[in-house]
């Protein structure tokens, strides 16, 4: 059964948990427990917004710990969830961080990056709202360059019509545009400096403000290129930057989702690595505690509270166990969800059912060369069989194994497709066997190829 897009009845609180699960089913196979957990977490956010009085601030999100091997859908569930709600979503690996005082990124940069995403989201929406006015102003600036500021309204109307019809797209003009060349080498962070905790120190911004940031330069360019540069410039002038920043901070604080992957790699196992490494891992966990529990992080846009940001942590936990995390951190991730390893049936469903399944992707790619690529049911079963075999014998990387198998399977077809226009190619089990059986039976080779 193929997952299809459904139109739902309007609910004042957005999608219901069952609707969220149905939406996730369009892209992700199985893992019902994990889908259910994130759907409830998302709905509880909407419920919290409708609670009145002081009680609303006391209701905090129940953060989630996903436990499962690589390639079973942990990241995809969180990513699709964020897209579903248009929430600012930030994914990071726990191994990227070091304890404060060591060289490397500190955990507060998570919130700074999340706010940056929220600001860009709000800016994009605001620019869409002012697009018509910005386009009008851009055309006026181009007309000034083409016919001069003192030209008659009749002349301007004639040229405006030509611009709108695209007749002047390849006409070269000389026009003043904002100088976006970075002054003083752009952005960087200075470890241990106050600026590092406030966000990124940008020398260009600092020097620009000191000298006056409205610097322009005259450039020669085609009308169509000028439109592409000037419309965003005019949009920036029309939107209320302070309002955007306030809305973005509010969006990040109340709807932000942070996905921390590989959290098992910072768990202290007591036997792996040197003592210093253990201390550093524990330090990162301790730095994460206030962030997940709720604190205020200073960013270049202003202070951001993390109390109502939803944190989803995940890890394979092959060597370490969830109980190896600091007890305080375990307590801040109260919902635990175990994701199942993928079976042969799951692999078959992954190849066929999602709206953006791999089979559909490869068929579409080869289809651009006017070649009709078709997969027989026997081929799908054989591919799934090989994926499970290699995962068991070499290393379990879940659904990601299908990518490497399909790339090897279709290598010759992808190479020769441009010379096969108008042809129909059917992939069956014999074709799969001919292409892959030698690699599958030689496990030493499979380790390197698949």
Swiss-Prot record:
Specify the species: Rickettsia felis (strain ATCC VR-1525 / URRWXCal2) (Rickettsia azadi)
According to its UniProt entry, the protein's GO biological process terms are: protein unfolding; proteolysis involved in protein catabolic process
Note whether Cytoplasm occurs among the keywords: yes
Q: What does this protein do?
A: ATPase subunit of a proteasome-like degradation complex; this subunit has chaperone activity. The binding of ATP and its subsequent hydrolysis by HslU are essential for unfolding of protein substrates subsequently hydrolyzed by HslV. HslU recognizes the N-terminal part of its protein substrates and unfolds these before they are guided to HslV for hydrolysis.
Name of the protein this chain belongs to: ATP-dependent protease ATPase subunit HslU
UniProt binding sites for ATP: 29, 71-76, 261, 328, 400
GO MF annotation: an example: proteasome-activating activity
Note the coiled coil stretches, chain numbering: none
Q: What Pfam families does the entry give?
A: AAA, AAA_2
Q: What family name appears in the similarity comment?
A: Belongs to the ClpX chaperone family. HslU subfamily.
Give the UniProt entry's GO cellular component terms: HslUV protease complex
Entry-linked PANTHER family: ATP-DEPENDENT CLP PROTEASE ATP-BINDING SUBUNIT CLPX-LIKE, MITOCHONDRIAL-RELATED, ATP-DEPENDENT PROTEASE ATPASE SUBUNIT HSLU
How does it associate, per the subunit comment?
A double ring-shaped homohexamer of HslV is capped on each side by a ring-shaped HslU homohexamer. The assembly of the HslU/HslV complex is dependent on binding of ATP.
- Establish whether keyword Cytoplasm is in the entry: yes
The record's section on InterPro entries has: AAA+_ATPase (IPR003593), ATP-dep_Clp_protease_ClpX (IPR050052), ATPase_AAA_core (IPR003959), Clp_ATPase_C (IPR019489), HslU (IPR004491), P-loop_NTPase (IPR027417)
Annotated SMART domains: AAA (SM00382), ClpB_D2-small (SM01086)
What keywords does the record list, in alphabetical order? ATP-binding, Chaperone, Cytoplasm, Nucleotide-binding
Q: Lineage of the native species?
A: Bacteria, Pseudomonadati, Pseudomonadota, Alphaproteobacteria, Rickettsiales
- Cell location: Cytoplasm
